[in-house]
Amino acid sequence: GPIPWQRRI
């Protein structure tokens, strides 16, 4: 993901 806390995207 685009941001560390949304890695799954």
Swiss-Prot record:
Keyword Secreted: yes
Tissue: Expressed by the skin glands.
GO process terms (BP): defense response
Subcellular location as annotated: Secreted
Disulfide bonds: none
UniProt entry keywords in alphabetical sequence: Amphibian defense peptide, Secreted
Recorded GO CC terms: extracellular region
Membership in a protein family: Belongs to the frog skin active peptide (FSAP) family. Tryptophillin subfamily.
Function (record text): Putative defense peptide.
Protein name, per record: Tryptophyllin-2
Origin organism lineage: Eukaryota, Metazoa, Chordata, Craniata, Vertebrata
